[in-house]
């Protein structure tokens, strides 16, 4: 079962053999929050390609060796650059999944679980993705509650990478 604030509230009440009470207020709050989350997911999805491309350029600026080092895991060729943009897009897509479900379940299940092994196997530096996510956070164009929602999932991934 995917972990969300609502599923956790139901599990808690059920384990205590009681009906939902204060959890209903949490549920209503989550429904209000869901509108902002969905707005953020829609906006990030619409801009995903341009955000991933610009975030890759931010990585190249901060870590110029990524474009001068030869090898399949670097951006010294167009194929390498395409892979970098693809990978950043994957991180962004996982952020939108978290926004849609209202919890970190997809991030935990699809990204964080195997992250260390993937980075080690392919010699990928977490600092590249941290830089890309920081760029996306600073430039996604969201404001208000949608920005707060998106930024919380971006920060969650940054913390997991750190």
From Swiss-Prot:
Quaternary state and interactors: Heterodimer of an alpha and a beta subunit, which further assembles into trimers and the trimers into hexamers.
Q: Pfam families under this entry?
A: Phycobilisome
What family is this?
Answer: Belongs to the phycobiliprotein family.
> Which membrane topology describes this protein?
Peripheral membrane protein
- In which broad location class does this protein mainly occur, judging by the first location in its UniProt entry? membrane
User: How does the record describe the protein's post-translational processing?
Assistant: Contains one covalently linked bilin chromophore.
One GO biological process this protein is involved in is:
photosynthesis
Q: What induces it?
A: Phycocyanin-3 is expressed in red light under conditions of sulfur deprivation.
Q: What does this protein do?
A: Light-harvesting photosynthetic bile pigment-protein from the phycobiliprotein complex (phycobilisome, PBS). Phycocyanin is the major phycobiliprotein in the PBS rod.
Gene it is expressed from: cpcA3
Q: Where in the cell is it found?
A: Cellular thylakoid membrane
Cite the SUPFAM superfamilies for this sequence: Globin-like (SSF46458)
Q: What is this protein called?
A: C-phycocyanin-3 alpha subunit
